[in-house]
Amino acid sequence: MKLSLVIPCYNEQDNVELFYNTATEVFKDKGFDYELIFVNDGSRDQTMDKLRHIYEIADENVKVVGFSRNFGKESAIYAGLKESRGEMVCLIDADMQQRPELVLDMMAILDKDPNYDAVACYQEDRRESKVLSAFKDCFYKIINKTSEIEFKSGASDFRLLRRCVVDAVLSMSEYHRFSKGIFSWVGFNTYYMPYIVEDRANGTSK
């Protein structure tokens, strides 16, 4: 079995090496192959230089995709999915707010129950203002009333997908992509796993 991690990066010069070192420690000697796919989304800092260094010192399990300018996280996710080769593919941020260790828990869920094709993480403890939380709750209530598909409140892009889900997502031709909507639209059974969003290791939220 092979696991692919797709890691969008925008101005993450202070975090990408920490992420790489942490992920390498988490996934070594676990009995499966894995690859790290870093997608530099037109960063204006030294993120690309740091990624080049990682690529030079790493084994062959590291890929780096670089955009000429900032196209946005949705485009970075799509590019990473296209590069992925794993039977399971995880979308995870580079800022360490989503801990790589949690991916093992997500994998265990899919290994245990073949009826699920994806694990999506949602924020159990929102470390944000009451106003922002209320706004988000209102957004999900409105969109669920007006949409044919249901969106889980607090769900993030942090998720693990079987290859069949990845292939279905890549087959869709939408130019302006909304990943959470697409993941719901393709219709595979999803397990929602609560998690606590950690503080950023370095820098500020994008």
Show which residues each predicted segment covers.
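A conserved acidic beta->alpha catalytic loop
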Residues: 40-49, 96-97
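Conserved donor nucleotide-binding strand/loop of the catalytic core
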Residues: 34-37, 48-83
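Cell-envelope/extracellular polymer assembly enzymes that use nucleotide-activated donors
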Residues: 2-4, 35
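Short, well-formed alpha-helical segments that are part of the catalytic scaffolds
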Residues: 12-27
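Acceptor/aglycone-binding surface of glycosyltransferases and processive sugar-polymer synthases
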Residues: 65-69, 73-83, 88, 100-182, ...
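Donor nucleotide-sugar binding loop of glycosyltransferases
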Residues: 12-15, 43, 99
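Catalytic beta-strand/loop signature of glycosyltransferases that borders the donor
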Residues: 190-197
